[in-house]
């Protein structure tokens, strides 16, 4: 979707530039061809103003092919590339839009808004290293702009900047710039996962002072638990015992987010964050009351008087929290009813794929495989799911077919999970346990623990959390997991890279 206000401002600025440029060309008595390039550009600008994107890009690309384009001043060329990016974005040619934004930001006229457009267009085509470069530029040159920028885009760029394993230095440069720019998430929450990685980089460079400085911003008990469990962080954990007191951290985070929610009465996003903190703390009855109050307010509000600004993006997670609280209280049937309602809530403006998969997952926990498969009906496999999401969907199908004793379909799905195991290694690990392949599951868990890039999640999985009510099939799955973790080879690897602790918090599954 094009940002209409920014587009209109760009088009108005281009109109002023065009008028001045034409007058200058006439005064200079240049050849008619000089005026022609301006006329072609203006044709493209007017088409863009009328939302005729194909017509606009045709005119702009015609101008770009004209020899006279190269004689234009750099500021004029900058505006033409910017118009081209808007036109391609309007016709959903995101690769073209990204290429034009890369050209536009090569000019000194480019400001923070233009670099943010480059990051947005890069994210559309999964060019995450370039998105990271754009955000780094903003954070360094316009740090004040970071506070008002799209925090979800910035977070995604920061987390995915080194997905190919070739841009570690550039990612650390980005994290350093974001830390200096005081980047925060909605409601002032810290991006704990980013600071976790920045602390690790400081320790790898034997800079304990810097590690302590960055660790001081980490708020979430879950991130602190992962760091306590990882031997790479021992120096900073020892130096900052107060920060890494998990019992205190759980209470501290609940208190902080309660105040944040009060200070942001129209934000569901901060209430979703608060909900996660309440789950960690085991305050399930409070979370249930909170979610019921929110759902009631939304349900009874008039269409033109929505009580929150982000209902479309966040309400489905409020339903998810309510269901999680009910399960944690052992109210299984009530939780299923809530999850069925959650499936009907839109997710980011489209079909709620996440809740459909979650519903299917819990149906197989309940021993209702037919319902699980039915919950997955209607999901657009090709367009609605990421590679990770497809693994979750297939795992639900695998468990359902196992319960139905449909060996052929179960084997077919297991073959898919095996072939695509790198898309979600944690899910493949669970599938191997379900299949009785403890040796394979152990080998994978050991490999994940020894891999510095995968250790965070693997160590988090092996911690001992406070007990929760479990259905029979959940208890069976937990028994298989404990058998895996108790193996001598797995236990030795855990001790080699970290430790297994009894965490004073809950790990409530979505």
For every predicted segment, state its role:
Residues 8-17:
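Bacterial N-terminal signal peptides
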Residues 23-28:
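Boundary at the C-terminal end of the N-terminal hydrophobic targeting segment
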Residues 33-42, 73-81, 108-117, 145-158, ...:
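Generic helix N-cap/helix-start motif at coil->alpha-helix transitions
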Residues 202, 425-510:
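Long, ordered, amphipathic alpha-helical scaffolds
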């Amino acid at each position: 979707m094009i940002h209409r206000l920014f587009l209109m401002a760009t088009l108005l600025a281009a109109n002023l530039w065009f008028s001045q440029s034409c007058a200058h060309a006439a005064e200079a008595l240049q050849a008619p061809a000089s005026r022609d390039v301006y006329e072609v550009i203006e044709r493209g600008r007017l088409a863009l103003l009328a939302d005729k994107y194909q017509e606009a890009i045709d005119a702009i690309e015609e101008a770009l092919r004209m020899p006279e384009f190269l004689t234009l001043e750099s500021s004029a060329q900058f505006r033409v590339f910017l118009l081209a990016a808007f036109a391609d974005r309007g016709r959903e040619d995101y690769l073209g839009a990204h290429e034009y934004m890369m050209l536009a930001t090569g000019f000194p006229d480019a400001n923070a808004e233009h670099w943010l457009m480059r990051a947005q267009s890069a994210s559309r085509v999964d060019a995450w290293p370039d998105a990271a470069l754009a955000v780094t530029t903003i954070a360094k040159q316009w740090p004040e702009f970071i506070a008002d920028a799209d925090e979800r885009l910035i977070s995604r760029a920061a987390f995915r900047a080194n997905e190919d394993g070739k841009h570690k230095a550039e990612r650390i440069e980005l994290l350093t710039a974001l830390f200096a720019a005081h980047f925060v998430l909605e409601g002032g929450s810290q991006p704990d996962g980013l600071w976790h990685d920045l602390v690790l980089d400081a320790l790898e460079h034997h800079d304990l002072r810097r590690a302590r400085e960055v660790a001081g911003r980490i708020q979430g008990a879950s991130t602190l638990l992962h760091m306590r469990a990882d031997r790479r962080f021992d120096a900073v954990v020892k130096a900052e015992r107060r920060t890494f007191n998990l019992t205190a951290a759980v209470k501290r985070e609940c208190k902080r987010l309660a105040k944040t929610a009060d200070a942001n009465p129209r934000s569901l996003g901060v209430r979703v964050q608060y909900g996660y903190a309440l789950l960690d703390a085991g305050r399930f009855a409070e979370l249930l009351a909170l979610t019921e109050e929110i759902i009631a307010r939304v349900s009874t509000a008039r269409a033109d008087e929505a009580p929150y600004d982000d209902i479309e993006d966040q309400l489905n997670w409020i339903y998810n929290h309510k269901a999680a609280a009910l399960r944690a209280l052992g109210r299984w049937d009530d939780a299923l009813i809530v999850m069925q309602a959650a499936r009907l809530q839109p997710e980011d403006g489209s079909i709620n794929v996440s809740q459909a998969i979650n519903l299917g997952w819990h149906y197989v926990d309940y021993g209702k495989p037919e319902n699980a498969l039915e919950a997955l009906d209607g999901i657009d496999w090709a367009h609605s799911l990421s590679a990770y999401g497809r693994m979750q969907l297939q795992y639900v199908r695998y468990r359902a077919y196992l319960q139905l004793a449909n060996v052929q379909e179960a084997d077919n799905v297991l073959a898919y999970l095996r072939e695509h195991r790198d898309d979600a290694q944690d899910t493949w690990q669970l599938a191997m346990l379900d299949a009785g392949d403890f040796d394979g599951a152990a080998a994978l868990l050991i490999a994940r623990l020894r891999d510095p890039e995968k250790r965070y999640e693997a160590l988090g999985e092996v911690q001992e959390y406070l007990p929760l009510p479990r259905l029979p099939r959940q208890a069976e799955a937990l028994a298989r997991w404990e058998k895996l973790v108790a193996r001598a080879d797995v236990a030795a690897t855990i001790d080699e890279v970290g430790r297994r602790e009894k965490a004073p918090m809950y790990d409530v599954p979505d």
